[in-house]
């Protein structure tokens, strides 16, 4: 039986096919990174200099808001402009298999067979947020492969909204006209992370009300009514319609400030999608002109460094037999009240794995 080639050789062959633009190589690279198989760090290290050209767009919102349908329409708009699109869809985890419970290929079947589109569903795997630990690295692989746009869609529950904002250049929050969504947006802190709001299913009653509520909140947040005041006092028109003031500010082509626009869409008809695509382009221009893009990407790099550090520490310490033996032999001391779990970790960090290995029975 022929022995499997070393990991370095497998990665080298994979990279050769990857550089040749073979879709199968892209799929294998994504799987290697997602599952952290042997060689994935070498792969990401080699690809790192090629990363940074793609625009990363995060899409989040409550279940049933039509995120996948709207994403499909946005993909169609980008493909019409001859742009290649990668989609990373984070799905709930199956409690039995640990895999994505509902792959987005089912919901995006109209674009799934397009050679200029790549779709991968990732599982949350029990993480508190909707973004799996591998999402940013998978996006890096798609970036290095040459995709122009990378859309990251999340389940929109828990802390996933914050996760998506950290992973994307631009964050789109999708709401629906049903009562309470706009107030819930404020409670969930979405006002702080949304770069664009979309009220989807706008053919339902209440869409204009939700948009006005969001624009009112934006107006209060950005102080637009106050800014509109003349030197003799308050602009009564702006105070009477702060939502319109926010809307007008959102349409300004100003590289120094950004007011999130609120866009009405009917995704299954394609209504509002051109305006959404235009607003995404405007926001990208703002990010570049204001320097905010560099700030966001540096913050993302810092978080990736911390993720790598956490992974390495976990692999080198918690998987070390000497460390496990030290913890096991320390359990009686914890039970007897001699030391707390925190004290054991302090001892572990002070001694370090090499010292523990020398003193373990």
Pin down the residues of each PLM region.
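Non-catalytic terminal/linker segments enriched in charged/polar, low-complexity residues
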Residues: 1-49, 233-245, 324-329, 344-361
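Nucleotide-state-sensitive switch-loop elements of NTP-binding domains
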Residues: 9-20, 27-65, 70-160, 167-182
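Residue-level signal for inorganic ion chemistry
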Residues: 22, 91, 153, 200, ...
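Glycine/charge-rich, flexible interdomain linkers and switch-proximal surface loops
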Residues: 44-63, 71, 93, 159, ...
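Alpha-helical scaffold elements adjacent to nucleotide-binding pockets in ATP/GTP-utilizing enzyme cores
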Residues: 101, 137-138, 163, 167, ...
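Flexible active-site lid/hinge loop adjacent to a nucleotide/diphosphate
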Residues: 177-205
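Canonical P-loop GTPase G-domain recognition
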Residues: 196-284
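Long, well-ordered amphipathic alpha-helical subdomains in the mid-to-C-terminal portions
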Residues: 256-259, 263-267, 271-356
């Amino acid at each position: 039986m022929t022995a499997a080639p070393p990991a370095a050789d497998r990665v080298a062959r994979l990279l050769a096919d990857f550089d040749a633009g073979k879709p199968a190589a892209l799929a294998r690279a994504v799987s290697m990174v997602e599952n952290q198989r042997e060689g994935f760090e070498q792969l990401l290290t080699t690809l790192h200099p090629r990363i940074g050209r793609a625009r990363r767009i995060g899409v989040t919102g409550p279940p049933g808001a039509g995120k996948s349908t709207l994403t499909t329409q946005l993909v169609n708009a980008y493909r019409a402009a001859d742009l290649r699109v990668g989609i990373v869809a984070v799905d709930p985890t199956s409690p039995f298999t640990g895999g994505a419970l509902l792959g987005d290929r089912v919901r995006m079947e109209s674009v799934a067979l397009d050679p200029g589109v790549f779709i991968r569903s990732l599982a949350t795997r029990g993480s508190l947020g909707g973004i799996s630990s591998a999402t940013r690295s998978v996006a890096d692989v798609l970036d290095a492969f040459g995709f122009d746009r990378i859309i990251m869609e999340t389940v929109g529950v828990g802390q996933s909204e914050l996760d998506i904002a950290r992973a994307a250049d631009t964050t789109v929050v999708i709401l629906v006209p049903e009562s309470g969504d706009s107030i819930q947006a404020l409670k969930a802190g979405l006002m702080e992370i949304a770069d664009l709001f979309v009220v989807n299913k706008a053919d339902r009653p209440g869409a204009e009300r939700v948009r006005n509520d969001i624009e009112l909140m934006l107006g209060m947040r950005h102080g637009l009514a106050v800014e509109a005041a003349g030197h003799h006092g308050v602009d009564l028109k702006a105070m009477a319609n702060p939502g319109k003031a926010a809307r007008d500010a959102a349409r300004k082509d100003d590289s120094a400030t950004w007011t999130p626009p609120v866009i009405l869409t009917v995704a299954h008809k394609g209504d509002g999608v051109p305006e959404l695509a235009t607003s995404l382009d405007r926001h990208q221009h703002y990010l570049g002109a204001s320097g905010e893009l560099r700030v966001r990407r540096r913050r993302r790099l810092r978080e990736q460094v911390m993720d790598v550090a956490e992974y390495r520490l976990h692999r080198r310490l918690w998987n070390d037999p000497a460390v496990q033996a030290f913890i096991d032999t320390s359990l009686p001391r914890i039970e007897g009240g001699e030391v707390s779990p925190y004290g054991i970790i302090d001892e572990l960090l002070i001694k370090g794995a090499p010292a523990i290995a020398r003193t373990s029975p």
